[in-house]
Amino acid sequence: MNPIGLGMRGLIRLYQLLLSPVLPASCRFTPSCSSYAMQAIEAHGPVGGTWLGLKRICRCHPWNDGGYDPVPPAHTERGGTMCPSRLPE
């Protein structure tokens, strides 16, 4: 992981350790929005992961039912997911 991604994950971890315990639990999703953002940054890099994390936070409100919402798989080729014909055997 590059230094920017590590720094961003470090900031999220600080939030989880310092702020999250004193705030009331309000995330409607599993995994929590902060865990989702960390996983997204790990899977998609700092830019793509941050974008996915922000979109997730915008969906986390009282009018959304929430539930299980995993990070989408990372693309293996620019602009698309791995084709079944290119899966390693």
UniProtKB/Swiss-Prot annotation:
InterPro entries attached to this UniProt entry: Membr_insert_effic_factor_YidD (IPR002696)
Pfam (any one): YidD
Membrane topology: Peripheral membrane protein
Membrane in keyword set: yes
Residue segments, region Disordered: 69-89
Keywords: Cell inner membrane, Cell membrane, Membrane
GO cellular component, one term: plasma membrane
Compartments (UniProt record): Cell inner membrane
Superkingdom of this protein's organism: Bacteria
Physiological role: Could be involved in insertion of integral membrane proteins into the membrane.
Similarity comment text for this entry: Belongs to the UPF0161 family.
Protein name as it appears in the record: Putative membrane protein insertion efficiency factor
Organism, scientific name: Paramagnetospirillum magneticum (strain ATCC 700264 / AMB-1) (Magnetospirillum magneticum)
Lineage: Bacteria, Pseudomonadati, Pseudomonadota, Alphaproteobacteria, Rhodospirillales
